[in-house]
């Protein structure tokens, strides 16, 4: 499990582990947010090679699974939040952090 603290517009890595490619629904990412983020509907974005994958945390969610579509290499991860009740388009964002995925030893078609 990887753990992160989101404070204002910065993501701090609290616990890091080695991530291997070819996983499916195996790597959990857990988030803690400061009070500024409480009202927001939260989404985690993973970007690799011009592809972006969104994982919805919602307003109460604190964890998500690493997208299986990601492969070995660097991945940029950021969080954004929005207030669905704010008609003026309030949005919170973070500076991305880099996660490194290592090539796994998996061979097969499972």
Model-derived regions: residue spans:
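N-terminal assembly/attachment segments of tailed bacteriophage virion structural proteins
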Residues: 1-108
């Amino acid at each position: 499990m990887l753990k992160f603290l989101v404070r204002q517009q910065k993501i701090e890595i609290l616990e890091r582990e080695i991530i291997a490619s070819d996983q499916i629904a195996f790597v959990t990412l857990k988030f803690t947010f400061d009070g500024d983020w409480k009202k927001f509907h939260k989404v985690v974005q993973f970007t690799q090679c011009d592809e972006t994958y969104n994982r919805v945390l919602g307003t109460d969610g604190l964890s998500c699974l690493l997208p299986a579509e990601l492969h070995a290499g660097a991945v940029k991860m950021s969080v954004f939040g929005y207030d669905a009740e704010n008609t003026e388009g309030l949005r919170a964002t973070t500076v991305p952090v880099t996660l490194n995925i290592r090539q796994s030893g998996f061979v097969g078609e499972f």
